[in-house]
Amino acid sequence: MKKLQNVFAAIKTGLLAKATSVTVIGSKRVFEILSRFENEGLIRGFQIIDISKNKVSIYLKYKQDMTSLLSKIKVVSVNKEKLYIKGKLLKKLNTGVNMYFVESKFGLQTLPQLKIRNKRLYAPLGGEIKYIVEINKVNPKIQELIKKKHEI
């Protein structure tokens, strides 16, 4: 968990400094989160630069006015305080400007992925909300593209 918090802190610091990339120590969970960020278009990508030390370079992404799509990255559930959500309540969460990472028996998934999986199940599954990524307010065209990407 601390590695992931360090990664989030490095990303935030890099975005504030308008850096093109940041280097962090990776783990399986870090790679999983970074691949989701890359798929969602929140970062340009990432690359392992030293396998023996597990160092990863994260390439940050900016809009034309040099502002980031990422507004905040919050670690919600920690060891002592966990936040769970029932499957029936997943439909009520608005994914328009926030990206939720939920840990369920299917592993770590974004909220739209879990909603799609729940459509196939008799009883919808919930899970533990691990991370919330707040996306900056963007122009409506980009926001529509993000919504369409989640629907596909």
From Swiss-Prot:
User: A cellular component term (GO) from this record?
Assistant: ribonucleoprotein complex
Main subcellular location of this protein, as a coarse class: mitochondrion
Q: What Pfam families does its record include?
A: Ribosomal_S8
- Please list the GO terms describing molecular function: structural constituent of ribosome
Its keywords, alphabetically, are: Mitochondrion, Ribonucleoprotein, Ribosomal protein
Q: Which Gene3D superfamilies match?
A: 3.30.1370.30
Q: What is any one GO biological process for this UniProt entry? A: translation
Keyword Transmembrane listed: no
The superkingdom of the source organism is Eukaryota
Q: Where does this polypeptide localize?
A: Mitochondrion
Belongs to which family?
A: Belongs to the universal ribosomal protein uS8 family.
Official protein name in the record: Small ribosomal subunit protein uS8m
- Organism for this UniProt entry: Dictyostelium discoideum (Social amoeba)
